[in-house]
């Protein structure tokens, strides 16, 4: 689909009249030590948890500097036929697993794909959890329970209390 002057996931969804959760966006980082690119594909309504991504990669990252030389077109990056100059890593967030009919970048300036089916179009994708947790979201461990986020009253003290309070408040650490 020709999408002139559209660069953000919000703009593309408005242009195509689709909700954010039916889109696949790319977030690009670089590894601190090597400057190799890391391209993260995640559902359009979610954000990347950089701590989870750093833990998965085993090294620190920073937001990428995208230039024409690297082969990426900011605002038009997609998982189909992705090519990046040099060494790079592609990460697919678990939120995309089993999804279809998504919109995404076509890796060509001013163009986007519609109808992306992850299992058909990216059959060998390996999915990991790198999304930020949302209040009311689905549990990334079991996929069933919804998550409730509450404000804490104290952060910074460490006590050897075991599970005394977490059990009494029916809380679970993910």
PLM regions with names:
Residues 1-174:
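Extended, low-hydrophobicity, polar/charged segments
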